[in-house]
Amino acid sequence: MATLEAIKYDGEKLLVLDQIKLPLETHYDEVLSIQDGWDAIREMRVRGAPAIAIVAALTIAVVMKRSTFATAAELAAFVRTSLEHLRTSRPTAVNLFEMAGRLEALLQEQPADCTEAALRQAVLSYIEGMMQADIADNQAIGKFGAEAILKDLSADVKVKVLTHCNTGSLATARYGTALGVIRSLHEQQRLEHAFCTETRPYNQGARLTAYELVTEGIPGTLVADSMVSLLMKQKGISAVVVGADRVVANGDTANKIGTYQIAIAAKHHGVPFFVAAPLTSVDLKLSHGSEITIEERPGKELTHIFGQQLAAPGIGTWNPAFDVTPADLITGIITERGVAYKAEGQQEFDMASFAASVGRA
């Protein structure tokens, strides 16, 4: 069965699947302006660090194609202003900032006599190449992740894997990161069962990951976030694999709220805990997880579901969207260039050395 598409782009039109309405309704919103793209990201109609970056970039592309600029300088100013605004949509996912930095570097590299047409083509080529690159990267992550989980097992053993939040086709251009690893295991007929958490308070696991598993015929079971420790104790979980919104130089990883407690439970039960993310999610400018800006979401997302209030009126809320899992709880970090592991006896990763060793640009 074909994988789901969170982003549809045909070179002229950009459609974004409204993931807030899933799984009850499948509806695509057309992005016509920079503000439309910002709203889709901020309101979490599109989410997942890779998808956020792609939608932001394609937003610039479609608006640029419908606009005219007298000079290359005028076009460059439009791109820079658009990036400045789009950066403010979600602060934790590093892919958006990585994309913006690379696009700004591309603008800076153009010769002084660059024409508007030449600059337009350079910007569009970079942006439109992002989707295909993301799909290829995700498939490589799936391959390397499956190998890492299976490497010490005999060929006839099937695995049970737990994941958190949504990291599949709905969070990327296609295929997925952590869910891509599960897909790869399933394609190899080495997956016995996938378990996904509901992922409160936004229920990305219940609404989105469960939807992807059912749609694609992958054997799966939904569990409440509070069931994870008992699940590991009683159901024989082989590995945990989660995504990442930002991995810093020592391997500390920001991911959807609830990831940290799953990592603690995995450590206690001796379950390998893997992070799956493209190298664009690795932020070598930050040394430790304490430096990551953690987005806080409106309290209504915690007290209401589909507009219906569940919590007692007047109760206070604290609603961080992410937490940081320390490197010492992480078994390996799966990327499109291979799996990063800690040196023997070390509690932290050396992501700079790993990135250099695999030729990260």
Curated annotation (Swiss-Prot):
EC number, UniProt record: 5.3.1.23
Main location: cytoplasm
Pathway(s) served: Amino-acid biosynthesis; L-methionine biosynthesis via salvage pathway; L-methionine from S-methyl-5-thio-alpha-D-ribose 1-phosphate: step 1/6
The keyword Cell wall biogenesis/degradation is assigned to this record: no
Signal peptide: none
Domain of life the protein comes from: Eukaryota
Site feature location: Transition state stabilizer: 165
Class of the enzyme per the UniProt entry, highest EC level: isomerase
Its job: Catalyzes the interconversion of methylthioribose-1-phosphate (MTR-1-P) into methylthioribulose-1-phosphate (MTRu-1-P).
The family this protein is said to belong to: Belongs to the eIF-2B alpha/beta/delta subunits family. MtnA subfamily.
Any Gene Ontology biological process: L-methionine salvage from methylthioadenosine
UniProt-annotated catalytic positions: 245 (proton donor)
Listed InterPro entries: IF-2B-related (IPR000649), IF-M1Pi (IPR005251), IF_2B-like_C (IPR042529), Initiation_fac_2B_a/b/d (IPR011559), M1Pi_N (IPR027363), NagB/RpiA_transferase-like (IPR037171)
Protein name in the entry: Methylthioribose-1-phosphate isomerase
Gene Ontology molecular function: any one: S-methyl-5-thioribose-1-phosphate isomerase activity
Key words, A-Z: Amino-acid biosynthesis, Cytoplasm, Isomerase, Methionine biosynthesis, Nucleus
Subcellular location: Cytoplasm; Nucleus
Keyword Cytoplasm part of the UniProt annotation: yes
GO cellular component: cytoplasm; nucleus
Catalyzed chemical reaction(s): 5-(methylsulfanyl)-alpha-D-ribose 1-phosphate = 5-(methylsulfanyl)-D-ribulose 1-phosphate
